Regions:
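Short pre-active-site segment immediately N-terminal to redox-active cysteine/selenocysteine motifs
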Residues: 282-284, 289-292, 362
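Conserved helix-turn-beta segment immediately C-terminal to the redox Cys motif
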Residues: 300-320
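N-proximal helix/coil linker or "cap" segments that precede and/or mark the start of modular domains
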Residues: 193-269, 277-280, 331-334
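Conserved redox-active cysteine motifs that mediate thiol-disulfide chemistry
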Residues: 288-305
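Alpha-helical adaptor scaffolds
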Residues: 101-155
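Thiol/disulfide oxidoreductase modules built on the thioredoxin-like
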Residues: 298, 334-338, 345-390
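Thiol-based oxidoreductase modules, predominantly thioredoxin-like and allied folds used
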Residues: 313-328, 338-349
Length: 400
């Protein structure tokens, strides 16, 4: 998954395609039709901005488009949400409100969010649609999400065919919240501004104080439980609960800052075998990228600059490429002057063995690994990334 227009939507929502029980088609009530029309009207007005974002070639261009989108969103969404709520409040007990309430919960107004979550809890706590709504926000960082998932998890009315989803989502939620303090510390100026704008400065201050060790320990326990109980349950086609649990457990146990980076053994884009440990003694920036990922390609110019800047110093850029068709990559490499080596993830692309083992759920994903092979940074971008690299390159030079 690539970065989108706001931090809250750059996080994995793996249940969007999960199979739901098929229900007979029922004509929606008039209020639900009106709410859907309000939503479609806003989306239509923002569509040109989304297209501009997809076409942007540099991080600076994307930052400008994000800034523009936030200004437009501030104009369009609040009145649209209020119009929708005037239709939804009187009908809150009707299951047909779930889709509309789920949409309104994207509001950045904490009071409105809590009102919506309160209505969902009161009337539709364990409906499949509400469970999917909560599961898809498991990694969103919203203040209410952990409480909602815990309430669903503990409910005696939780349907058996939905239990796996809540179990997995709660594990994901706790893992994500455990990572937030480090992620905020490494956030670029652009991402930091977006975090403040999406969640509010008070909420971001709370996130920075999360007890990462406690949250991580509980998430690890939940991942082990759900992986053992529902190993073959399909989350989306080609991805099972067992696979997700295994990747997440591996990330928690082996991919934290301060831990030795696991070995990667694979082939580069020319088919030659190599290992991550081949670069021991140098600081490594490990970049998970793909040509289908706009933000990944937007980073290429800066990555070229880093390669040139550190040419005579102990630094190496190593990629992990997620394109399923290696043959088409030759033109991409030549056009973008990509000279550094990349592991190829295989013909399954982002679901290949390396990205799956490293639990990569957002593209690009960047690691800074020091000369001793220890992970020193995850997901840093912009000036923060540059500072991390310079810090550890200097330390590597000092040891020589």
């Amino acid at each position: 998954m690539i970065r989108s227009l706001a931090v809250s939507f750059a996080l994995l929502a793996p249940f969007a395609c999960a199979d739901e029980p098929k229900k007979p088609e029922v004509k929606p009530p008039a209020f639900a039709v009106e709410v859907a029309a309000i939503q479609q009207d806003v989306q239509k007005k923002l569509e040109p901005i989304y297209k501009d974002f997809d076409a942007a070639k540099t991080e600076r261009e994307r930052d400008a488009i994000v800034a523009k989108s936030l200004v437009e969103a501030d104009k369009l969404y609040p009145p649209a949400y209020e119009r929708a709520m005037k239709l939804l409040r009187p009908n809150a007990a009707d299951p047909a409100t779930i889709a509309g309430l789920s949409w309104v919960c994207n509001s950045r107004d904490p009071a409105l969010q809590m009102e919506v979550v309160g209505l969902l809890r009161r009337h539709h706590l364990v409906y499949p649609e509400t469970i999917t709504f909560a599961a898809n926000r498991a990694r969103s960082g919203n203040a209410w999400i952990q409480g909602l998932l815990r309430e669903q998890f503990a409910s005696p009315d939780l349907p058996e065919d939905q239990a796996w989803k809540v179990h997995l989502a709660l594990a994901m939620c706790l893992q994500s919240q455990a990572q937030l303090p480090a992620r905020l510390a490494d956030a670029s100026e652009s991402d930091a501004r977006q975090f403040d704008r999406v969640f509010g400065k008070e909420r971001v201050a709370e996130m920075k104080k999360f007890d990462s060790a406690k949250l991580e320990l509980e998430s690890l326990k939940l991942f082990k439980e759900v992986g053992e109980k529902y190993p073959k349950q399909v989350v989306i086609p080609g991805l099972t609960v067992g696979q997700m649990a295994t990747s997440s457990i591996f990330e928690i146990e082996h991919l934290g800052v301060g831990k030795v980076a696991p070995e990667i053994v694979g082939e580069d884009l020319d088919g030659a075998k190599f290992k991550l440990s081949d670069y021991r003694g140098q600081v490594v920036m490990l970049s998970f990228w793909a040509s289908w990922c706009g933000p990944c390609m937007g980073l290429i110019p800066h990555e070229r600059e880093l390669v040139a800047k550190y040419k005579a110093r102990p630094f190496t850029l190593v990629g992990v490429n997620g394109d399923p068709d290696k043959k088409e990559l030759k033109a991409v490499l030549e056009t973008n002057k990509i000279t550094w080596r990349s592991f190829w993830a295989g013909d399954k692309g982002p679901e290949g063995p390396i990205p799956m083992t490293w639990n990569v759920n957002m593209w690009p994903t960047l690691y800074v690994i020091d000369a001793e092979g220890v992970i020193r940074s995850k997901m840093a971008l912009g000036a923060t990334l540059d500072a991390r690299i310079e810090e550890w390159v200097k330390k590597a030079e000092a040891k020589k």
